[in-house]
């Protein structure tokens, strides 16, 4: 598919006829759908979203206060596109890929209107090393060379929407992103920079079934409800249940090579937290600051609503670009509900027929359009790359039956349900293990067998069984107390408490417990299973539940979470536990 030309073309100017918040109507404007236009005397950036006869309806990505009918509107002739090339990593952009650092230097802490800034620095020079030579045939999307951007190698590619060709000359050395680095035999010239329309998914050779988990270091996610690389997940939850902290934990510790974090309509303080924390935190795989693998898109709640839609598309396009280099990318969108609310506002300004709860009828289509751009793929240059999308959903009052949550659940394959009751009990992450699910378990079964342990999947099923059994017994316990239960079920209640408090609870602010690798998760779960087996054997031998639940070694188990070199202390606890149970059985 040929994408619109990079250069803006001058067209006849239109005139503003009507203004309704972020939606304006122009007349006498020669425009196509999704053209980027400049609105008013201040040249505010907007996008054509509807054409009705001579009326061109535009959503404006900046505040429209003070503009009036009669002001000019000019069409750039381009669709909303992002600049892709060296310099993306460590950047922080607004929803339309204006670097906030550049805007601060231009106008201070408060963004003025009508200011444009390129997404990449056009002055900075990058050292380009070619990987192809003169005479080589290059296909669309082929890797031409490399730039050491941070600790990550940025692969410079031929745009995916051009014809194949033969390299005539290719240069090595220091260049800006605009300088020509390769000339093909048919005379076509290409720099390091590409521009790509955000609404058009970047092409791939084929989509594949995901079979490798995206490891996050969070026990409840990796252990019970894993997401695959190239998978989709939703984190719905009421206010204050920990959506943003969970998203930030995933951005910090997930084993993706690149992280794109979109703050879409959420509080500005949350983006500030990411900006202040990430440069000081070390990436566990590379040992470098986490910021070096991150692209941030800050579109906070006080920014114009129309730009929320742009921020989501900008983020996924940048993620696809890194995927095309053969990297695993994880994209966090916090929160897709704010984007849906922006759609609702724009839709009502357009006087469209509302759907459920006032959301537009095309809500489901837009959400699936976004989530379907995730996936594990074979790229055009025959590499394997993936984009994993994790979207937070903020249902008002924690009502999971509202349209955004329901439509999201229909699309995604992993559901991490945050629970206000758990967060009020200070159980974090507050993910409800009874309501959550992952549809990737079967696909990831073999990976866990080979890379963790052949009995990991059985251990996981056992833990889930114990937690479900506890939920069934909870009603009786609340009515008559746990002492009225049969002895075996008293032990089940105790083992479930251990799984909850030792395995599922995790402290995001503890230097060790914030990230837990799969081996440690397996060893912790195995220790709890050992206690369960020893307890059931002791109970069958006549030992009372009161004695079983008060053994000393068990009380030391929770401390293992906070110990980095845990192998020896854990082996000692298991040995002591065995000895104590032997003593109890002998006494019985």
Swiss-Prot record:
GO terms for biological process: proton motive force-driven plasma membrane ATP synthesis. InterPro entries: ATP-synt_VA_C, ATP-synth_a_Xtn, ATP_synth_asu-like_sf, ATP_synth_asu_arc, ATPase_a/bsu_AS, ATPase_F1/V1/A1_a/bsu_N, ATPase_F1/V1/A1_a/bsu_N_sf, ATPase_F1/V1/A1_a/bsu_nucl-bd. Its EC number is 7.1.2.2. It comes from the Archaea. Keywords: ATP synthesis, ATP-binding, Cell membrane, Hydrogen ion transport, Ion transport, Membrane, Nucleotide-binding, Translocase, Transport. The keyword Transferase does not apply. Gene3D superfamilies: 2.40.30.20, 2.40.50.100, Bovine Mitochondrial F1-atpase, Atp Synthase Beta Chain, Chain D, domain 3 (1.10.1140.10), P-loop containing nucleotide triphosphate hydrolases (3.40.50.300). It is a peripheral membrane protein. One of its GO terms (cellular component) is proton-transporting two-sector ATPase complex, catalytic domain. It is found in: Cell membrane. PROSITE patterns: ATPASE_ALPHA_BETA. NCBIfam families: ATP_syn_A_arch, PRK04192.1. HAMAP family: ATP_synth_A_arch. This is A-type ATP synthase subunit A.
């Amino acid at each position: 598919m040929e994408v619109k030309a990079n250069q803006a073309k001058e067209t006849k100017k239109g005139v503003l006829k009507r203004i309704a918040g972020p939606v304006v109507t122009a007349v006498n404007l020669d425009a196509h759908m999704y053209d980027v236009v400049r609105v008013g005397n201040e040249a505010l950036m907007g996008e054509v979203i509807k054409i009705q006869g001579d009326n061109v309806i535009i959503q404006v990505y900046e505040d429209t206060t003070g503009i009036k009918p009669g002001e000019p509107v000019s069409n750039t002739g381009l669709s909303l596109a992002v600049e892709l090339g060296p310099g993306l990593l460590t950047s922080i952009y607004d929803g339309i890929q204006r670097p906030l650092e550049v805007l601060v230097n231009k106008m201070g802490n408060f963004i003025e209107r009508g200011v444009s800034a390129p997404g990449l620095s056009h002055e900075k020079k990058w050292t380009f090393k070619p990987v192809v030579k003169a005479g080589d045939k290059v296909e669309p999307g082929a890797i031409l060379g490399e730039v050491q951007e941070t600790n990550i190698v940025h692969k410079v590619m031929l745009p995916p929407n051009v014809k194949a060709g033969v390299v005539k000359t290719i240069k090595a050395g220091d260049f800006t992103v605009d300088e020509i680095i390769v000339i093909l035999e048919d005379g076509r010239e290409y720099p390091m920079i590409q521009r790509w329309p955000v609404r058009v998914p970047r092409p791939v050779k084929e989509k594949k079934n995901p079979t490798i988990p995206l490891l996050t270091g969070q026990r409840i996610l990796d252990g019970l409800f894993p997401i695959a690389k190239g998978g989709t997940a939703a984190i719905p939850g009421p206010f204050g249940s920990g959506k943003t902290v969970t998203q930030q934990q995933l951005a910090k510790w997930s084993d993706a090579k690149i992280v794109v974090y979109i703050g879409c309509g959420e509080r500005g303080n949350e983006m500030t937290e990411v900006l202040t924390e990430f440069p000081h935190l070390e990436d566990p795989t590379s040992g470098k600051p986490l910021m070096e693998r991150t692209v941030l898109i800050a579109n906070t709640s006080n920014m114009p609503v129309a730009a929320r839609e742009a921020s989501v598309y900008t983020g996924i396009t940048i993620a696809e670009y890194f995927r095309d280099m053969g990297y695993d990318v994880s994209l966090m969108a916090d929160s897709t509900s704010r984007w849906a609310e922006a759609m609702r506002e724009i839709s009502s300004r357009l006087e469209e027929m509302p759907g459920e709860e006032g959301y537009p009828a095309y809500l489901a289509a837009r959400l699936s359009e976004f989530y379907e751009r995730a996936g594990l793929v074979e790229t055009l240059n025959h590499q394997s790359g993936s984009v994993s999308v994790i979207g937070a959903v903020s249902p008002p009052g924690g009502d999971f039956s509202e349209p955004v949550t329901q439509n999201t659940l229909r699309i995604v394959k992993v559901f991490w349900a945050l629970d206000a009751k758990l967060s009020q009990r200070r159980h974090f992450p507050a993910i409800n293990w009874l309501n959550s699910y992952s549809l990737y378990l079967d696909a990831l079964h073999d990976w866990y067998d080979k890379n963790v342990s052949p009995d990991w999947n059985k251990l996981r099923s056992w833990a889930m069984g114990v937690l479900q059994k506890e939920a069934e017994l909870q009603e009786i316990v609340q009515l008559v107390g746990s002492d009225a239960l049969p002895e075996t079920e008293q032990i089940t209640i105790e083992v479930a408490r251990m799984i909850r408090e030792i395995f599922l609870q995790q402290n995001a602010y503890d230097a060790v417990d914030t990230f837990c690798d799969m081996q440690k998760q397996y060893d912790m779960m195995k220790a709890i299973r050992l206690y369960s087996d020893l307890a059931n054997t002791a109970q069958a031998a006549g030992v009372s539940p009161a004695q079983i639940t008060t053994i000393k070694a068990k009380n030391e188990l929770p401390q293992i979470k906070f110990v980095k070199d845990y192998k020896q202390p854990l082996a000692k606890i298991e040995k002591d536990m065995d000895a104590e149970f032997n003593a109890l059985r002998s006494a019985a």
